[in-house]
């Protein structure tokens, strides 16, 4: 029964996004909400300048409608769904403000790092308070074992690090057509399967809604992209994947399922440390996907390779949590 519900949720979310996009994209174009491309980025990206951005709004609306509709239809609407929506929409609003400043107010840097961090902290603390109100355990289980560690009050810093880290990691990864949408669909799909197998049904349904939304978006975001999700989408998806991991008690597994995002972030950190300490860059450009672009790979080849790596990470996570445990 639940398998059908998950599939129907995914399909509903997908259809909503596919229907909305042909209406929403021309609207964004009329408003001149076009993406500006950094001069220091790969030269091949300059032709993307002016492509409509803030497409993450379509993803958010699709997730909101499909998850609420299915939850109410099955009479399983709960604090779980509410908290997941709080994080997703909260980070989405933060991303929208950032996009608005860059696109409409023509301030290329958008929100300052401090302003963005404050917004992320506010959402993270509200999410944590909701978790405490639900009585969610502060224990963190080690995958493929029965061992767990009780973080106690240190669970709050963990929640903050996960939400802030994941949202920024997904945001960094969003640099090629279809890259985040594809890897995101795989990652959220893995969480849907794991949440279903471990009886976190509301989390599974929400995850399925996200999968459908990003797959629908991928139809218009794959190369050559007709629309970009912007920070509106990438920050929302990053916050959502961390919140799902926390709600499903798969905190450590997030590192594996989000392996592509972790690698992309590490490439930036390594590049910065190397340049500041040695005066040399390890990669031709960071994040890592740009390094491969400048090495002669086509954009599509880089994206498909990263999707494949993401799929392998997802399969490993499912194996560890579903088959071994």
UniProtKB/Swiss-Prot annotation:
PANTHER family linked: PHOSPHO-N-ACETYLMURAMOYL-PENTAPEPTIDE-TRANSFERASE, PHOSPHO-N-ACETYLMURAMOYL-PENTAPEPTIDE-TRANSFERASE HOMOLOG
A GO MF term: UDP-N-acetylmuramoyl-L-alanyl-D-glutamyl-meso-2,6-diaminopimelyl-D-alanyl-D-alanine:undecaprenyl-phosphate transferase activity
InterPro entries noted in UniProt: Glycosyl_transferase_4 (IPR000715), PNAcMuramoyl-5peptid_Trfase (IPR003524), PNAcMuramoyl-5peptid_Trfase_CS (IPR018480)
GO BP, sorted A to Z: cell division; cell wall organization; peptidoglycan biosynthetic process; regulation of cell shape
Enzyme class: transferase
The protein, known as: Phospho-N-acetylmuramoyl-pentapeptide-transferase
UniProt keywords, alphabetically: Cell cycle, Cell division, Cell membrane, Cell shape, Cell wall biogenesis/degradation, Magnesium, Membrane, Metal-binding, Peptidoglycan synthesis, Transferase, Transmembrane, Transmembrane helix
One Gene Ontology CC term in the entry: plasma membrane
EC annotation from Swiss-Prot or TrEMBL: 2.7.8.13
Record pathway: Cell wall biogenesis; peptidoglycan biosynthesis
Protein family: Belongs to the glycosyltransferase 4 family. MraY subfamily.
Catalytic activities: UDP-N-acetyl-alpha-D-muramoyl-L-alanyl-gamma-D-glutamyl-meso-2,6-diaminopimeloyl-D-alanyl-D-alanine + di-trans,octa-cis-undecaprenyl phosphate = di-trans,octa-cis-undecaprenyl diphospho-N-acetyl-alpha-D-muramoyl-L-alanyl-D-glutamyl-meso-2,6-diaminopimeloyl-D-alanyl-D-alanine + UMP
Cofactors that this protein relies on: Mg(2+)
Subcellular location: Cell membrane
Family annotation (CDD domains): GT_MraY
Protein role: Catalyzes the initial step of the lipid cycle reactions in the biosynthesis of the cell wall peptidoglycan: transfers peptidoglycan precursor phospho-MurNAc-pentapeptide from UDP-MurNAc-pentapeptide onto the lipid carrier undecaprenyl phosphate, yielding undecaprenyl-pyrophosphoryl-MurNAc-pentapeptide, known as lipid I.
Chief place of localization: membrane
Record-linked NCBIfam families: mraY
Lipid bilayer topology: Multi-pass membrane protein
Gene this chain is encoded by: mraY
Organism: Halalkalibacterium halodurans (strain ATCC BAA-125 / DSM 18197 / FERM 7344 / JCM 9153 / C-125) (Bacillus halodurans)
Residue ranges of the TM segments: 5-25, 57-77, 81-101, 117-137, 146-166, 178-198, 200-220, 227-247, 252-272, 304-324
């Amino acid at each position: 029964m639940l398998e059908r519900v998950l599939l129907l949720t995914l399909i509903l979310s997908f259809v909503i996004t596919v229907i909305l996009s042909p209406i929403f994209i021309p609207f964004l174009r009329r408003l001149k909400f076009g993406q500006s491309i950094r001069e220091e980025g790969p030269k091949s990206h300059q032709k993307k300048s002016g492509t409509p951005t803030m497409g993450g709004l379509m993803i958010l609306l699709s997730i909101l409608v499909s998850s609420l509709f299915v939850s109410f239809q099955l009479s399983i609407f709960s604090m779980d769904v509410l908290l997941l929506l709080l994080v997703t929409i909260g980070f989405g609003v933060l991303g929208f403000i950032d996009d608005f400043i860059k696109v409409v107010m023509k301030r290329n840097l958008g929100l300052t790092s401090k302003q963005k961090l404050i917004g992320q902290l506010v959402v993270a603390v509200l999410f944590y308070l909701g978790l405490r109100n639900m009585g969610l355990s502060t224990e963190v289980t080690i995958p493929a074992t029965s061992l767990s560690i009780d973080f106690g009050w240190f669970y709050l810093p963990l929640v903050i690090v996960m939400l802030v880290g994941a949202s920024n990691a997904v945001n960094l990864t969003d640099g090629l057509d279809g890259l985040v949408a594809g890897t995101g669909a795989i990652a959220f799909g893995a969480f849907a399967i794991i949440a279903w197998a471990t009886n976190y049904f509301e989390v599974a349904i929400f995850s399925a809604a996200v999968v459908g939304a990003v797959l629908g978006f991928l139809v218009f975001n794959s190369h050559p992209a007709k629309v970009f999700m912007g920070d509106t989408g990438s920050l929302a998806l990053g916050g959502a994947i961390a919140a799902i991991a926390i709600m499903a008690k798969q905190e450590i597994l997030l590192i594996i399922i989000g392996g592509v995002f972790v690698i992309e972030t590490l490439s930036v950190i390594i590049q910065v440390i190397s340049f500041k300490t040695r005066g040399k860059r390890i990669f031709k450009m960071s994040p890592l996907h740009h390094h491969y672009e400048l090495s002669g790979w086509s954009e599509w080849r880089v994206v498909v390779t990263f999707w494949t790596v993401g799929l392998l990470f997802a399969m490993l996570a499912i194996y560890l949590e579903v088959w071994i445990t």
